[in-house]
Amino acid sequence: SNHAIGYQSQLANVDGVANVSFGRGTLATNVSGNHNTAIGHQALETFNSDVDAYNTAVGMNNLQAITTGIYNTSVGALVLDAASFGESFNTAIGFAAMTSVNEGAHASAQADHNVAVGYNALEGGAFAGNPVVFTGNIAIGSLALDGTGANAQTGTIAIGYEALTALTGSSSSGTVAIGYQSMEALTAGDGNTA
């Protein structure tokens, strides 16, 4: 069974099951997707996939534009709100965490398996049809790893306020920065540890 409260909540649902939505426009375009939870104005608004998706969006505009992503968890306003394709297995908590991540339509592009906790943590960018891989990153702390834009990033870890905040280079995979403003000025470079 489904539970929907709010103007146009689950508006298009035909045979989706086990969905819970509360708020205006939550899960509005979902026709057949299952096991989603959307709480907050326009959370999961454009999701429309016929799979057991298990997405959880709590907060205004969370996962608002996503269409097919699965197993995402977002808590806070404007979290993962630009993601609009198959972004999956991401956990983002805090105002505007992963707010600009959008893997685009390129078949090889990935924005999966990331963890972002804190204000604007792991902001990301729109890949604009490029085969960018943005996977396995961890950002914990306000503005941690927030400057990557649309560049590739794999296995990068930033823990602490503004840790790796200036990192923009796509050749910085495997870098680990722990502590207040740790490697704050680093813009590129693989395998650094601080």
Question: What is each residue range found by the language model?
Answer:
Residues 1-194:
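Glycine- and small/polar-enriched repetitive beta-structure motifs of secreted/surface proteins
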